[in-house]
Amino acid sequence: MVSLLKSLSYSIKYNKSIYPSIEKKFKEYRTYTKRIRKLSVKATAREALDKSRFDAAVSSICLLYDKTNTELAAEVLFSFDAIVQYLNSICLRSYTGTEPFLKLIFSSLRDALNLRTDAYENYFTFFPSKDDDGYLTILVEKCRQKVLLLPSYNVIRDHLAAFISLFIDLQVTKFSSDDNAKEVNLINWSTAHGQKYPELSCWEYCMAVDSNLSIRLLLAMATDPELSEQKAENLNSAFFPWICCIHKILEGYINYNDDLFSGNINYDFYYENLKEYENRIIFFMDRALKFKTGQWSHTRMAAKLLLGIYITHPKASEGMNGITSKALLKAGGRGMFFYTWALKLLRSKIYL
């Protein structure tokens, strides 16, 4: 009964508050893509924006906590997700994966999160077309404007700076490495940075950082004017690395066939079989729920919703993925039926 009530509560909140905020920002950002003259860059921007809708659904699990300002948090997270997805799409489609290029365009994330006070740079200096007609700069400024409204920004700033530095460093390592050196470079990177988490494989540490759910959680929590450093630390310890790892396993599973065909990095390739990453999801959920804070039930709900969002994705029922989805549903434990039911209802109304 508790799971039913919570799933209904989430469904109503998503329908009434989160979805309208996402759609408002989506339509606003869609108009900005019209300024991009180069057709290939415009197509990349619009495709990335479409993907940001699903990212926003994933980010919604960060909006469950008490005293979160849902409307402000949804807008901040969509703005951040839109930049990350745009940068990722550019990198996947660009042959200019040099370190100077990658460091420069990913520095836009620091500007978007108000982590440096320098004037914005020409992020596309090393890009073949030299410019996207200011589209990325607009995204950065729109995100920064929302970040400046966060009442508890100073509480999360140091954590935010640390996580964004790791995230950028990983992206530069991942996208600047050629196919032959990529695995070795990522292993070396993880070995150098992930020593604090011996329970994780090198690929799982990369997963946790690549997820950036920890960054989204911090931004959402900062909408709470009464946020304490202790509360921020406790909640973030549940998300990073545990729920972040669950996120990337699930993302990898729905993109498995696409990435196999395209040659994109997919961390699920490094698990031996379905049973192994099913067991790892259970392990990560157990670790996340070890943190018995006042928000424990919200964290449990966030983990189950995250599973449900991916299990109900259209790709989750394609081919062998149907078997995987049933196993992941079981891994989610009691109450998963109600969460997946609520999410399927949202999908049927094109809210998700």
Predicted regions and their residues:
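Acidic (Asp/Glu-rich) catalytic motifs at the cytosolic membrane interface
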Residues: F80-S94, H247-D258
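All-alpha helical catalytic cores of prenyl diphosphate-utilizing isoprenoid enzymes
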Residues: Y19-S60, A73-A74, I105-Y253, N257, ...
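Active-site/pore-lining binding-face segments in mid-to-C-terminal subdomains
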Residues: K231-L306
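Internal amphipathic alpha-helical repeat/solenoid segments
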Residues: L63-L64
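Alpha-helix boundary/capping segments in eukaryotic regulatory proteins
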Residues: T68-L72, I90-G97
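Post-HEXXH active-site segment of zinc metalloproteases
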Residues: T98-R110, N266-Y267
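Extreme N-terminal leader/anchor segments
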Residues: M1-S11
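Acidic, carboxylate-rich catalytic segments that either coordinate divalent cations
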Residues: G308-L352
